[in-house]
Amino acid sequence: MDVYPRYIAGAIWDADPTADLRYITIDQLRNDPKTAESISAASELSVLVAGVTVPGKYLSGSPATARDALTIPRSLKSRHTVLCGPAARFGFGRGGGTTTEIPRSLPSLYEFVISGDPETVIHELITNGFNQRTDTDTVRQRSNDVNRYAAKGAPIVRQHPCFPDGLICEVETFRGCPRSLRGGCSFCTEPLHGTPDFRSVAGIAGEMGALASSGAVNFRFGRQPDLLIFGSKDENECPEPNPGAVKRLFTAARRAAPSLRVLHIDNINPTTIFHHPDASEEALKHIVELHTPGDVAALGVESADEEVVRKNNLKVYPEGALFAISVINGIGNRRGENGMPHLLPGINFVYGLPGETKNTFSANFWFMKKVLEMGLMVRRINMRQLMVMPSTRLASFGDHLARKHRHLFIRHKMQMRADVDKPMLERVVPTWTVLRGVRTELAEGRMTWSRQIGSYPLLVGIPAALPLGISLDVAILSHGPRSVGGLPVPLRINRMGLRELQSIPGIGSKRAATLIRRRPFKSGNELSTALDDRSILEPMAGLIDLT
């Protein structure tokens, strides 16, 4: 759950402590528009949060689209209506390789379109009786201004359909980018916030304590370009990490939410590690000591083509990126209690930037092949064509290069998935690795898709129809380029269907049919005899249940 609905709820409750708030996801509204209409009809105010600043693919939910924003107003019967979120400021994109825009008719469909900070503007609207002269571009002056709204809005999490086990709460640590001093990356919106403005540790802990008191158990420190520089005293383009501040942040989080199950991070700037290796290593060690395993440090490498790096003022050249990947591996590759390595890098590549040629795709591919050949691990490789935003330095360049290179991008993506992603997943979660706390999310025929809760969790396909929303321990049995296959443990051989048995390494259709015909088995020896190859049984011996 992002900060928007929680901040907005906190602003409303701060202005009117007796307000009765209802929160529904966009997917709930799509599935049951009549209920949403009846809730709106009984309300004074309806707020739609819409849009994203980074395009992506989603498993069991998706953000509000331009089509949603254009059609939903017909169902909003409240006296006042508000549109806010990234779409209200930057518009809607049609995915990667496009330019965002606000549909011409959209502003006329809502009473207020908030391009500033929603919680600040909505608080002012309520206290001023929805004055039409309210400045909808208003932004908070300091990051700490949000602390009271963040804490007061925490109880709204109870209304999320995935609460509590399947819900992870995004927690903002700061906004702004030190690289804004030199313009920042050409495509990024973060420099628009100026230099970093850190929230206080006390303010963040207060929010997390309120969330924990409301029942939240999963958290992610997100919404910042580089967590390593949290609390840094430097005021330059590449500030040195403050390991003590990072430790205080995570220690305070643990104290505020002592029963938390997940504490993960998001973005880290690879150039920080390259230029400040000692301080970065110390800060990373504090993170690994105090977070929960299965964590991912998303590195904005963006391109391994040095010409693209130079033309777009990107963060790091390939040498520095490779160094950062190596450092994170050295500290975070130990496997944790949930079966995943503690902390691995995730690599982000952006395509369609000025300076991109056919050689760019080759440079990115061979960069990742080198990572693989060095024996290093990355959790994910995120390849996306840029989404051009207004007010960024790339706005005047547009999306023409992304459209021109679309066919190159698709071919390159397929090559990266086959030649890098698949062998990398085999390294990150070898066959027979047991992942703990895998939650079922989506059923497609006789396949159930599931994931652990966390930052960029690994997608696990289970070849059986299972109830959704349950937590399982799963043994990994096969690897694809973007997901893995597995079975719940213990392996109940006497109860499994044909497809489940066939998914076990070494058991094909003939052996699976034999097992079904000759079961139930009362001992491992009986099972071993039926398999006619003892080596098949050896890796799963401790995982079998013959009841």
Where are these predicted regions, by residue range?
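Glycine-rich beta-alpha loop elements in corrinoid/cobalamin-binding modules
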Residues: 20-144, 437
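Conserved SAM/AdoMet-binding glycine-rich loop
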Residues: 209-356, 367
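Terminal RNA-binding accessory module
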Residues: 403-491
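Catalytic cores of alpha/beta
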Residues: 95-104, 278-284, 353-372
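Alpha-helical interaction/regulatory segments in DNA maintenance proteins
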Residues: 528-547
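Canonical Radical SAM [4Fe-4S] cluster-binding loop centered on the CxxxCxxC motif
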Residues: 162-203
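Radical SAM enzyme [4Fe-4S]-AdoMet core and its adjacent flexible, acidic
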Residues: 232-244, 311, 354, 359, ...
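Small-residue hinge/turn detector
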Residues: 508-509
